[in-house]
C-alpha cells in the first residue's frame, strides 16, 4: 500500500502542560484549523472535542490522552499536506502516568505555558519526563491576553527552572488587553489574525516602528542560534552577517531535533491567535518518524536489536494505552515503529509470549472513529480484539521477534478501602476494578489479608475519586469509600549479617534450609537488589531463586507497622543444605526468617511521601498561607512574585495535606489555588513514626 502521506510529512506530537495552561483549548484549535472540527469546543462550557469522558467535561480537566489524526498545509496553504497525530495529555499531577505513556510514543511535543503562571510544578515534571525520553519540544506561551501576561518572564523561568535553552522565533505585539498579534522573527513581518473568521484568515504587515529595534535584537539571537547547527551555516553567517529563511529554518530544525534548543512562540488559543503559526512551527521544527533514531529492543535470545522506521522492515509496535470504549469494547492504542499490519493479521506479544489476532483497526479523532484496513510505520491507531495486551507491551511480527523497551510506572502514594453498597455489586466491582487497573498501570487493586477489604491505590485523591466515579458511570457499581490512607514505606539504616534456619527433621522426609544474609541500605529509589555471593556450592544453584523469592515475599510487610520495605540490598553469602531434606520451600522459609530478623536489627525506619506543593495566593494572605504550611511540617523552598500574587513553593508530607483545599479556600477567601505532586520518600520524624506504629 502506497502511503497517502510520505513518512517525512508525518508528525507524531503531544500537547503537554500544567493544568489550566490552556492545553485542551490549544488542542481544540488545532482540530478546528486543520478542518476536522467545525464548531470550536470550549472547555468552559464542557463541550471540548478532545475531552471525551463525562468526568473530564464536568471537571474541565483532561484525563485520558485522546489520539487524533489531522492534516495541515500551513496557515497560508504553502506547505505540502502533512499528517499530524496529536496526543492530548493531562496536566493534572494525579495523571502523570498518562503523560509518561504518551511521551514514550511521540516524536515531538508542544509545551503550553501560561503567560501569567509561567513554569509551574507540573511543567517541571512533564519537562523531566520529556528529557527522559529525549523528546524535542516547542514552547507555546498561551494566554497572552490575560492580565499579568509576560512572555520574557516565561523565557527567564524556562532558563532558570527547566535549565533549557529557549529561542524566541516570535515576539508578542502588546500584552494583556493590548495583545494584537505576533512578530514572526524568521520573516521579519507582523502577523494579525482576523477575529471575524475565528482566526482562519490573517494578514502580514510591516513591524510596528516602536518594535523594530527589539525585533532586530531578538532576530539576531535567533539567527546566531540557527548558525550553530553546522559549520556550513556558521561560515555563511560569518561571511554575510545573516542567513536566508530556508537556512534559519534548517538550522533551528537540526538543533531542535537534537534537543539543543526550544523554539518559543506565543498567542492566545482562546482568542484564536497564534495556534495557526504554532502548527506551521510543528512542520518546520519537529521531527518526522524518519528523523529519530531507530527504536531499540531485544530479540528472542536477549540480544540488543533495533527496528528502523521503514515499511519494508518487519512489523513492530508498542501498546501505550488501553481504553474502554462504550461502543466497541476495549481499545488498545499503539504506535507502529516499523512494517505494516492489516486487520485480521496475527501478531506476537513477546512480553506475554502469546499470539493475538488483530480484529478491527480504528483511527481516532477524539471519540469519533474511522475504520481502516491497514496501518504502517509512523501511524498511531487503535485495535479491537486483543485480549491479553497491557500498557507497555510490544506487538511484533511472528517470525521476527523483538521486545521494545518497556515503560517505568511510579508506585502509588495513597490508598483507600472501597466496598460495594450491595451484594449484587460485589462481583461487578471486582470486574470493574480489574478492567480499570488494566487501563491504568499507576492504579492498583489488592485485598487486605487481615480485614478482607478491597484496597485501591493511586497517585492522589483526585485520581481515586475519578476511578470510583468511573465504576459508577461505566460499570453501574455504587461503592462506599473509606478515608484516604498514606502509603508509608519501611527501610533500614545500617548493615547487618544475619542467619536464617528452617529445619524440621523428625523421621521421614524433613525440611532443611539454612542461609546467611548480609542486609544493607540501598540508594534511595533503587528498590530491592539481590546479590548471589555463594562460593563452592554451599547452597546449591537450584535453591538460590527460592531464597530470592522468599526475600521478595517478605518485602510486602515490614517489621515496624507492616508497610512495604524499600531500598534494601541483600546478599546471600553463606549457608548449608541437606542432601535429602533440603527443598525450595525450606530455603524460601529460611530466607524469610532471616529477613524479618535482620530488619529488626538493622535500625528500621518509617518513610513517608513528601509532596512538592505550590500555592498561588494574593499577597495579603501570604503570612496566613506560609504559617499554615509550616504548621503542617512543611519546609518552604522559595517564593516568586507575579503581579498581585505570591507563589509559595514548599515540601510538605502527604499525611498533612488531606482536606487542604477547603482550609486554603477559607484562609484566602477562595482566592488562592494550589497544586501538589509526589516528590520523594523521606524518613518520618520519631514522634510521627511512633504515632503511626501505635495506630497499627
From Swiss-Prot:
<dbReference type="InterPro" id="IPR041095">
    <property type="entry name" value="EFG_II"/>
</dbReference>
<dbReference type="InterPro" id="IPR005225">
    <property type="entry name" value="Small_GTP-bd"/>
</dbReference>
<dbReference type="InterPro" id="IPR000640">
    <property type="entry name" value="EFG_V-like"/>
</dbReference>
<dbReference type="GO" id="GO:0005525">
    <property type="term" value="F:GTP binding"/>
</dbReference>
<comment type="similarity">
    <text>Belongs to the TRAFAC class translation factor GTPase superfamily. Classic translation factor GTPase family. EF-G/EF-2 subfamily.</text>
</comment>
<dbReference type="Pfam" id="PF00009">
    <property type="entry name" value="GTP_EFTU"/>
</dbReference>
<dbReference type="InterPro" id="IPR000795">
    <property type="entry name" value="T_Tr_GTP-bd_dom"/>
</dbReference>
<dbReference type="Pfam" id="PF03144">
    <property type="entry name" value="GTP_EFTU_D2"/>
</dbReference>
<dbReference type="InterPro" id="IPR014721">
    <property type="entry name" value="Ribsml_uS5_D2-typ_fold_subgr"/>
</dbReference>
<dbReference type="InterPro" id="IPR005517">
    <property type="entry name" value="Transl_elong_EFG/EF2_IV"/>
</dbReference>
<feature type="binding site">
    <location>
        <begin position="142"/>
        <end position="145"/>
    </location>
    <ligand>
        <name>GTP</name>
    </ligand>
</feature>
<dbReference type="InterPro" id="IPR031157">
    <property type="entry name" value="G_TR_CS"/>
</dbReference>
<dbReference type="InterPro" id="IPR047872">
    <property type="entry name" value="EFG_IV"/>
</dbReference>
<keyword id="KW-0547">Nucleotide-binding</keyword>
<dbReference type="InterPro" id="IPR020568">
    <property type="entry name" value="Ribosomal_Su5_D2-typ_SF"/>
</dbReference>
<dbReference type="GO" id="GO:0032790">
    <property type="term" value="P:ribosome disassembly"/>
</dbReference>
<dbReference type="Pfam" id="PF03764">
    <property type="entry name" value="EFG_IV"/>
</dbReference>
<keyword id="KW-0342">GTP-binding</keyword>
<feature type="domain" description="tr-type G">
    <location>
        <begin position="8"/>
        <end position="290"/>
    </location>
</feature>
<dbReference type="GO" id="GO:0003924">
    <property type="term" value="F:GTPase activity"/>
</dbReference>
<dbReference type="InterPro" id="IPR035647">
    <property type="entry name" value="EFG_III/V"/>
</dbReference>
<dbReference type="Pfam" id="PF14492">
    <property type="entry name" value="EFG_III"/>
</dbReference>
<dbReference type="Pfam" id="PF00679">
    <property type="entry name" value="EFG_C"/>
</dbReference>
<dbReference type="InterPro" id="IPR004540">
    <property type="entry name" value="Transl_elong_EFG/EF2"/>
</dbReference>
<dbReference type="GO" id="GO:0097216">
    <property type="term" value="F:guanosine tetraphosphate binding"/>
</dbReference>
<dbReference type="InterPro" id="IPR009022">
    <property type="entry name" value="EFG_III"/>
</dbReference>
<dbReference type="InterPro" id="IPR035649">
    <property type="entry name" value="EFG_V"/>
</dbReference>
<dbReference type="GO" id="GO:0005737">
    <property type="term" value="C:cytoplasm"/>
</dbReference>
<protein>
    <recommendedName>
        <fullName>Elongation factor G</fullName>
    </recommendedName>
</protein>
<dbReference type="InterPro" id="IPR009000">
    <property type="entry name" value="Transl_B-barrel_sf"/>
</dbReference>
<comment type="function">
    <text>Catalyzes the GTP-dependent ribosomal translocation step during translation elongation. During this step, the ribosome changes from the pre-translocational (PRE) to the post-translocational (POST) state as the newly formed A-site-bound peptidyl-tRNA and P-site-bound deacylated tRNA move to the P and E sites, respectively. Catalyzes the coordinated movement of the two tRNA molecules, the mRNA and conformational changes in the ribosome.</text>
</comment>
<dbReference type="GO" id="GO:0003746">
    <property type="term" value="F:translation elongation factor activity"/>
</dbReference>
<feature type="binding site">
    <location>
        <begin position="88"/>
        <end position="92"/>
    </location>
    <ligand>
        <name>GTP</name>
    </ligand>
</feature>
<keyword id="KW-0963">Cytoplasm</keyword>
<keyword id="KW-0648">Protein biosynthesis</keyword>
<feature type="binding site">
    <location>
        <begin position="17"/>
        <end position="24"/>
    </location>
    <ligand>
        <name>GTP</name>
    </ligand>
</feature>
<keyword id="KW-0251">Elongation factor</keyword>
<dbReference type="InterPro" id="IPR004161">
    <property type="entry name" value="EFTu-like_2"/>
</dbReference>
<dbReference type="InterPro" id="IPR027417">
    <property type="entry name" value="P-loop_NTPase"/>
</dbReference>
Amino acid at each position: 500500500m502506497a502511503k497517502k502521506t510520505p513518512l517525512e510529512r508525518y508528525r507524531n506530537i503531544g500537547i503537554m502542560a500544567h493544568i489550566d495552561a490552556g492545553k485542551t483549548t490549544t488542542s481544540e484549535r488545532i482540530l478546528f484549523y486543520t478542518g476536522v472540527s467545525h464548531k470550536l469546543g470550549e472547555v468552559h462550557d464542557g463541550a471540548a472535542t478532545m475531552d471525551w469522558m463525562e468526568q473530564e467535561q464536568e471537571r474541565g480537566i483532561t484525563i485520558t490522552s485522546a489520539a487524533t489524526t489531522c492534516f495541515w498545509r500551513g496557515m497560508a496553504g504553502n506547505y505540502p499536506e502533512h499528517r499530524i497525530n496529536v496526543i492530548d495529555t493531562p496536566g493534572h499531577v494525579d495523571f502523570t502516568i498518562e503523560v509518561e505513556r504518551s511521551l514514550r510514543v511521540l516524536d515531538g511535543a508542544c509545551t503550553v505555558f501560561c503567560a501569567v503562571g509561567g513554569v509551574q510544578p507540573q511543567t517541571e515534571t512533564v519537562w523531566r519526563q520529556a528529557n527522559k525520553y529525549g523528546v524535542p519540544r516547542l514552547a507555546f506561551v498561551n494566554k497572552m491576553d490575560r492580565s499579568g501576561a509576560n512572555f520574557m518572564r516565561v523565557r527567564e523561568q524556562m532558563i532558570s527552572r527547566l535549565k533549557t535553552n529557549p529561542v524566541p522565533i516570535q515576539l508578542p505585539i502588546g500584552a494583556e488587553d493590548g495583545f494584537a498579534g505576533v512578530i514572526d522573527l524568521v520573516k521579519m513581518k507582523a502577523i494579525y489574525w482576523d477575529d471575524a473568521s475565528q482566526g482562519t484568515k490573517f494578514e502580514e504587515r510591516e513591524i510596528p516602528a516602536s518594535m523594530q529595534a527589539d525585533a532586530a535584537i531578538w532576530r539576531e539571537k535567533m539567527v546566531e542560534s540557527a548558525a550553530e547547527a553546522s559549520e556550513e551555516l556558521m561560515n555563511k553567517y560569518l561571511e554575510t552577517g545573516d542567513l536566508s529563511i530556508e537556512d534559519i529554518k534548517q538550522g533551528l530544525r537540526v538543533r531542535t531535533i537534537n534537543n539543543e534548543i526550544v523554539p518559543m512562540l506565543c498567542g492566545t488559543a482562546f482568542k484564536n491567535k497564534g495556534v495557526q503559526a504554532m502548527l506551521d512551527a510543528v512542520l518546520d521544527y519537529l521531527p518526522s518518524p524518519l528523523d529519530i533514531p531507530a527504536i531499540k529492543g531485544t530479540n528472542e535470545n536477549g540480544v540488543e536489536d533495533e527496528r528502523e522506521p521503514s515499511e519494508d522492515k518487519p512489523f513492530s509496535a508498542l501498546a501505550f494505552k488501553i481504553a474502554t470504549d462504550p461502543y466497541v469494547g476495549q481499545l488498545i492504542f499503539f504506535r507502529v515503529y516499523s512494517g505494516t499490519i492489516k486487520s485480521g493479521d496475527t501478531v506476537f506479544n513477546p512480553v506475554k509470549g502469546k499470539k493475538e489476532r488483530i480484529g478491527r483497526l480504528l483511527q481516532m479523532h477524539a471519540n469519533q472513529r474511522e475504520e481502516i484496513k491497514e496501518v504502517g510505520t509512523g501511524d498511531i491507531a487503535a485495535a479491537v480484539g486483543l485480549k491479553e495486551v497491557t500498557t507497555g507491551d510490544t506487538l511484533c511480527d511472528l517470525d521476527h521477534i523483538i521486545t521494545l523497551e518497556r515503560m517505568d510506572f511510579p508506585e502509588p502514594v495513597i490508598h483507600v478501602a472501597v466496598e460495594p453498597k450491595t451484594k449484587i455489586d460485589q462481583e461487578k466491582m471486582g470486574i470493574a476494578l480489574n478492567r480499570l487497573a488494566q487501563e491504568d498501570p499507576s492504579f492498583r487493586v489488592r485485598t487486605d489479608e487481615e480485614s478482607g477489604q478491597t484496597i485501591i491505590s493511586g497517585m492522589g485523591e483526585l485520581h481515586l475519586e475519578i476511578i470510583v466515579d468511573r465504576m459508577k458511570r461505566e460499570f453501574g457499581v455504587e461503592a462506599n469509600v473509606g478515608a484516604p490512607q498514606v502509603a508509608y514505606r519501611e527501610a533500614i539504616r545500617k548493615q547487618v549479617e544475619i542467619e536464617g534456619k528452617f529445619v524440621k527433621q523428625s523421621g521421614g522426609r524433613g525440611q532443611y534450609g539454612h542461609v546467611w544474609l548480609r542486609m544493607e541500605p540501598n540508594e534511595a529509589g533503587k528498590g530491592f537488589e539481590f546479590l548471589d555471593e555463594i562460593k563452592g556450592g554451599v547452597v546449591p544453584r537450584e535453591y538460590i531463586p527460592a531464597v530470592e523469592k522468599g526475600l521478595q515475599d517478605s518485602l510486602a510487610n515490614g517489621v515496624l507497622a507492616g508497610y512495604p520495605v524499600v531500598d534494601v540490598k541483600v546478599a546471600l553469602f553463606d549457608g548449608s543444605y541437606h542432601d535429602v531434606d533440603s527443598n525450595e520451600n525450606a530455603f524460601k522459609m529460611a530466607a524469610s526468617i532471616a529477613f524479618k530478623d535482620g530488619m529488626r536489627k538493622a535500625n528500621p525506619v518509617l518513610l513517608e511521601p513528601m509532596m512538592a506543593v505550590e500555592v498561588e495566593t494574593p499577597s495579603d494572605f501570604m503570612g496566613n498561607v506560609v504559617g499554615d504550611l509550616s504548621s503542617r511540617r512543611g519546609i518552604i523552598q522559595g517564593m516568586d512574585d507575579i503581579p498581585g500574587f505570591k507563589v509559595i513553593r514548599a515540601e510538605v508530607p502527604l499525611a498533612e495535606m488531606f482536606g487542604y483545599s477547603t482550609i486554603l479556600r477559607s484562609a484566602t477567601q477562595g482566592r488562592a489555588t494550589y497544586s501538589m505532586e509526589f516528590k520523594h520518600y523521606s524518613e518520618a520524624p520519631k514522634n510521627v513514626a511512633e504515632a503511626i506504629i501505635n495506630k497499627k
